């Protein structure tokens, strides 16, 4: 089981089996890469490695659900869904995964749930685990966008600075595509910039 008192009835092996059954081969490979990077970052920064592994394995567990099914999950669990349906559709899967963790899979640790929820957007006052999962998703081994190698090097030296640059890239990408920007991403960048100037 995941470390004592972390609010989970699910082991890392169980999480791995669960997501393998729910995801395409390509998405599953990405998930395993995120897990490896998350554990590496957790070791580097002294975070709980098992929590990092579990959050990473579950972060995209709802990614391939139809939008209608995610909306139904939110409607059925309005209190814990945190108005997710009002957010841009590309971020729904993090909230849907968090709801499923709580209602079906026995994962209730607030740190793990938070990291799953905000892995696409970031948010204000991100915890160390939030930052690790966000960065692990951005820099997992199969990613090959311009600047990813620089982020991989930077995140091992200064996580806050890497987060700042990753959020800037993410915002630029969303704007370039003409998609709506989640307000949590702007708040996360403001926080990250403040942390880098302290």
Please report, for each region that a protein language model flagged, where it lies by residue.
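Divalent metal-dependent catalytic cores for phosphoryl transfer on phosphate-bearing substrates
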Residues: 14-21, 39, 44-165
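N-terminal glycine-rich anion-binding loops that anchor highly charged ligand groups
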Residues: 30
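Long, amphipathic alpha-helical surface segments
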Residues: 159, 163-177
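Generic secondary-structure signature for well-ordered alpha-helical cores
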Residues: 24, 43, 121, 172-179
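Short, Lys/Arg-enriched N-terminal segments with co-localized hydrophobic residues
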Residues: 1-9
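Charged phosphate-binding loop/patch that engages nucleotide di/tri-phosphates or the phosphate backbone
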Residues: 172-198
